[in-house]
């Protein structure tokens, strides 16, 4: 489901790169908050619609009752990672647009390590089976999101003084954001 919203990363990186090239620190700041905000809004919608999304998936894909039960367990745990994952798409695109591809790489490596360690621990030490794998994934998603926030706060905190909340959701700017991401 998440990669449907990959435009958050791709469009954000292009627009941020343009603002970076123009040395427009205000627009750079707005783009981060806009992309993360849109990601969090979409995640909220996914959380609200999780039941019909899962039912639609099982309508489209025929499975055995056992697979459906396991997939349901996994889905209902992992869906709570939507805010972290979609928010991280915004951060990753923004970091790349800021000519910093190392931070997304560090975050991805950290997420993978956390996911492996947590999933193995939950499955083999706590015998949580598929719920353990899902919980490990969920923890890794939030570890990546919080790492992105910490990296932003540590290395880009000077941009926080440029935040003007009403400019983030300007109608014309939001239209441009979605227009770029649509194409």
Where are these regions (language model features)?
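Short alpha-helical transmembrane interface motifs in multi-pass membrane proteins
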Residues: 1, 37-39, 72-78, 102-106, ...
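Small-residue-rich hydrophobic transmembrane alpha-helices
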Residues: 1-47, 85-103
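Hydrophobic alpha-helical elements at and bordering transmembrane segments
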Residues: 28, 32, 71, 75, ...
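Residue-level recognition of transmembrane alpha-helices
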Residues: 39, 75-78, 82, 100, ...
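Membrane-embedded alpha-helical segments of multi-pass transporters/permeases
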Residues: 44-55, 60, 77, 116, ...
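Alpha-helical transmembrane segments of multi-pass membrane proteins
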Residues: 49, 65-91
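Membrane-interface helix-loop junctions in multi-pass transport and translocation proteins
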Residues: 112-146
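Interhelical loop/hinge segments that connect adjacent transmembrane helices in multipass membrane
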Residues: 137, 149-183
